[in-house]
Amino acid sequence: MLLARALFGDVGEECAVCHPKETAAYQKSRMGNSIAPPAPLAGEKIMRPSQRVEISIAVRDGRMIHSLNENGLTAEYPIAYQIGAGKVGHTYVVRIGEFLFESPASWYRTTGWDLSPGYERMAAVDFDRLVDSGCMFCHADNGKFVGSDGRRFSGETLEPIGCDRCHGSAAAHIADPSARNIVNPAKLSGRARNSVCEQCHLEGVTRLLNPGKKWGDYHPGEPLEQTAVTILLTENKAGEKEEISAVAQAEQLALSQCARQSGGKLWCATCHHPHGESTDRQREMRQICQSCHSSYANAVSKATHGSLTDCVSCHMPRLTPDDIPHTASTDHRIVRRPAPLPDGSAAGAEISLWQDPPAKVRARDLAVAALTIGGLRNLPYLRAEGVKLLEALPPRERDDDPAVLSSLISIRLKDREPQKAQEFARRAIQLQPDSAFASLNLAFALQDGGDEEGAEKQLLETIKLDPSLQQAWTALTFLYEKQKRESDRAALLDRFLGWNPQNIWFRQLKAILARQ
């Protein structure tokens, strides 16, 4: 926390002039310390024999260094930031040029150092998981990412979540302090009020930006679905319980009878205080629960509900999320009796929208979601539904929407229609000429269509647009190998390693190809 102050200054300095109590408490809160320079915390080595990986954490001259040894190749990076206030743990970020990458090593409060979430399932471990604007939206206040793809970081520093994330821009309020020109979430209507929390504490299976929107376009006081929609997926796999995401509190609370029967009175801030929690959290929570359930603390069941009962430990038990190891999440369903998550009983899965976006983009959002989730989860019927919905969109909506075009390219490539995929890819580039993803899609479409010369030129253009996009480098490497252009292949690998000389995968690839 002190390191964050030293580099960033106080969160909400201008707000503190009139609101010293709130800002002082917020500076100690989890959101007020969402990102910071890394604390000098050294640790033991992380060993993964099955992956032939060893990661070391050290501190040199006050700087945290993460070192990787994989199959005899070593790499080490200075850590630029730590994400998380430390209540659960810290994830770490390195900077390579204009790009940010997640370290494969994280620190967990309960278990210490281990692989970052998801890396335990990967065949190879490296510092190559890019952190983009979508990742950083809920962890930093000033994520200055530029370009259509939101991958290139242009700022000097990343700062913790600030006051404006919940209260909106304070410029007018500072010039003329008034309750009329600042957002107070507690005084908003239910949908706008809940959206303030849902911008980060609602995940679903995926979230999609509406056409023409970026993550920074959301402003407190607006319904979140005007900017982005959250897609829910109910998987009815027999004998398996539904998944819980790490930030699925909003979905769980919506299932709670307490919330449903409160008429909208029970919401996030009923129990949580963004400016900082109380020191006697158990007592505070007991009082909140007993404001509606006082009878359970006395006459109804003195045997089990005494005056000092800890309501949360029984009715909001800890759960282990499926997607992030080593962490715990409180069950926000507020169950009467501890109960597992519902078991499915029938095959199939359905998608739905958490809240409806503007009517004109609803069909589009469902189409892109069905196709995306169907592909990621290997649900062919869901993918087929996405194809059907996409093809039913009016041509104007299809042709002017990069996300829709990207989905259509995927469809055409899978259906072995490279010429049609090329048409969609060229249109996507017209809309977003700086998009490396659009350029890469065209390269793949050209290659599938047999135009290797065109594919080569487009892959080189993709690399120029975004040197961090390893798929482009890899595709071009194998194209040169197919064409037996050994000198061009070697020069390409050297060029990549000139940009990122420590990358394990490309060093291994260079060594393998050199032996052939």
Q: Model-flagged regions — what are they?
A:
Residues 398-399, 433, 467, 501:
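Short coil turns that delineate tetratricopeptide repeat
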Residues 414, 448-449, 482, 512-516:
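Register position in tetratricopeptide repeats
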Residues 393, 427-428, 461-462, 495-496:
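Canonical positions in the second alpha-helix
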Residues 13, 21-85, 89-96, 115-120, ...:
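Primarily the internal scaffold of c-type cytochrome electron-transfer domains
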Residues 401-403, 436-437, 470-471, 504-505:
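Helix-start (N-cap) detector for alpha-helical repeat units in TPR-like alpha-solenoids
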